[in-house]
Amino acid sequence: MFGKGGMGNLMKQAQQMQERMQKMQEQLAEMEVVGEAGAGMVKVTMAGSHSVRRIEIDQSLMEDDKEMIEDLVAAAVNDAVRRVEEQSKSKMGELTGGMQLPPGMKLPF
Protein backbone atom coordinates (compact mmCIF):
# COMPACT_ATOMS: atom_id res chain seq x y z
CA MET A 1 0.00 0.00 0.00
CA PHE A 2 2.73 2.48 0.94
CA GLY A 3 5.49 0.99 -1.20
CA LYS A 4 9.10 0.47 -0.26
CA GLY A 5 9.91 2.61 2.78
CA GLY A 6 6.64 4.49 2.37
CA MET A 7 5.41 4.02 5.92
CA GLY A 8 8.76 5.05 7.36
CA ASN A 9 8.81 8.16 5.18
CA LEU A 10 5.25 8.98 6.18
CA MET A 11 6.14 8.74 9.88
CA LYS A 12 9.25 10.87 9.34
CA GLN A 13 7.19 13.54 7.56
CA ALA A 14 4.62 13.54 10.36
CA GLN A 15 7.37 14.00 12.95
CA GLN A 16 8.92 16.86 10.94
CA MET A 17 5.52 18.54 10.64
CA GLN A 18 5.02 18.22 14.40
CA GLU A 19 8.43 19.79 15.05
CA ARG A 20 7.68 22.67 12.66
CA MET A 21 4.32 23.23 14.35
CA GLN A 22 5.98 23.34 17.77
CA LYS A 23 8.48 25.91 16.52
CA MET A 24 5.69 27.95 14.91
CA GLN A 25 3.69 27.94 18.17
CA GLU A 26 6.74 29.24 20.03
CA GLN A 27 7.18 32.01 17.45
CA LEU A 28 3.51 32.93 17.67
CA ALA A 29 3.69 33.13 21.48
CA GLU A 30 6.60 35.59 21.18
CA MET A 31 4.83 37.72 18.57
CA GLU A 32 3.31 41.05 19.62
CA VAL A 33 0.53 42.99 17.95
CA VAL A 34 -0.93 46.39 18.77
CA GLY A 35 -4.68 46.92 18.66
CA GLU A 36 -5.96 50.48 18.46
CA ALA A 37 -9.18 52.39 19.02
CA GLY A 38 -10.17 56.04 18.99
CA ALA A 39 -7.75 56.90 16.17
CA GLY A 40 -4.83 55.50 18.17
CA MET A 41 -5.74 57.20 21.44
CA VAL A 42 -6.05 53.79 23.11
CA LYS A 43 -3.53 51.07 22.27
CA VAL A 44 -3.35 47.51 23.54
CA THR A 45 -0.21 45.45 23.04
CA MET A 46 -1.01 41.74 23.02
CA ALA A 47 1.17 38.65 22.78
CA GLY A 48 0.44 35.88 20.32
CA SER A 49 -0.80 33.86 23.29
CA HIS A 50 -3.57 36.48 23.72
CA SER A 51 -2.12 37.86 26.96
CA VAL A 52 -2.31 41.65 27.22
CA ARG A 53 1.15 43.08 27.80
CA ARG A 54 0.43 46.79 27.84
CA ILE A 55 -2.41 49.31 27.62
CA GLU A 56 -1.67 52.89 26.61
CA ILE A 57 -4.28 55.64 27.02
CA ASP A 58 -3.62 59.08 25.56
CA GLN A 59 -3.47 61.71 28.30
CA SER A 60 -6.15 63.80 26.59
CA LEU A 61 -8.71 61.04 27.26
CA MET A 62 -8.20 61.25 31.01
CA GLU A 63 -10.50 64.24 31.13
CA ASP A 64 -13.29 62.40 29.28
CA ASP A 65 -15.91 60.20 30.84
CA LYS A 66 -15.04 56.80 32.27
CA GLU A 67 -17.56 54.90 30.14
CA MET A 68 -16.07 56.17 26.88
CA ILE A 69 -12.57 55.15 27.99
CA GLU A 70 -13.83 51.68 28.92
CA ASP A 71 -15.47 51.33 25.49
CA LEU A 72 -12.26 52.36 23.74
CA VAL A 73 -10.18 49.92 25.80
CA ALA A 74 -12.59 47.10 24.94
CA ALA A 75 -12.46 48.03 21.24
CA ALA A 76 -8.64 48.11 21.30
CA VAL A 77 -8.50 44.69 22.99
CA ASN A 78 -10.88 43.27 20.38
CA ASP A 79 -8.75 44.78 17.61
CA ALA A 80 -5.62 43.20 19.10
CA VAL A 81 -7.34 39.79 19.32
CA ARG A 82 -8.38 40.08 15.67
CA ARG A 83 -4.81 40.93 14.67
CA VAL A 84 -3.37 37.99 16.63
CA GLU A 85 -5.84 35.66 14.90
CA GLU A 86 -4.94 37.05 11.47
CA GLN A 87 -1.20 36.67 12.09
CA SER A 88 -1.65 33.17 13.51
CA LYS A 89 -3.74 32.10 10.52
CA SER A 90 -1.16 33.54 8.13
CA LYS A 91 1.77 31.82 9.86
CA MET A 92 -0.02 28.49 10.09
CA GLY A 93 -0.99 28.82 6.42
CA GLU A 94 2.69 29.08 5.58
CA LEU A 95 3.37 25.95 7.60
CA THR A 96 0.57 23.87 6.09
CA GLY A 97 1.18 25.08 2.55
CA GLY A 98 -2.21 26.75 2.38
CA MET A 99 -4.08 23.56 3.27
CA GLN A 100 -7.60 24.60 4.23
CA LEU A 101 -8.96 23.19 7.48
CA PRO A 102 -12.66 22.70 8.18
CA PRO A 103 -14.36 25.69 9.87
CA GLY A 104 -13.70 25.78 13.60
CA MET A 105 -10.73 23.43 13.40
CA LYS A 106 -7.49 24.97 14.61
CA LEU A 107 -3.91 23.80 14.60
CA PRO A 108 -2.60 22.00 16.47
CA PHE A 109 -5.50 19.57 16.54
From Swiss-Prot:
UniProt KW keywords: Cytoplasm, DNA-binding
GO cellular component terms given for this protein: bacterial nucleoid; cytosol
Family: Belongs to the YbaB/EbfC family.
Predominant location: cytoplasm
Spans annotated as Disordered: 1-23, 87-109
Protein name: Nucleoid-associated protein ASA_2087
Organism for this UniProt entry: Aeromonas salmonicida (strain A449)
Binding partners and assembly: Homodimer.
HAMAP family for the chain: DNA_YbaB_EbfC (MF_00274)
Function: Binds to DNA and alters its conformation. May be involved in regulation of gene expression, nucleoid organization and DNA protection.
Compartment(s) where it occurs, according to its Swiss-Prot or TrEMBL record: Cytoplasm, Nucleoid
Domain of life: Bacteria
InterPro entries cross-referenced by the UniProt entry: YbaB-like_sf, YbaB/EbfC
Comp. bias (Low complexity): 11-23
Example of a GO MF term: DNA binding
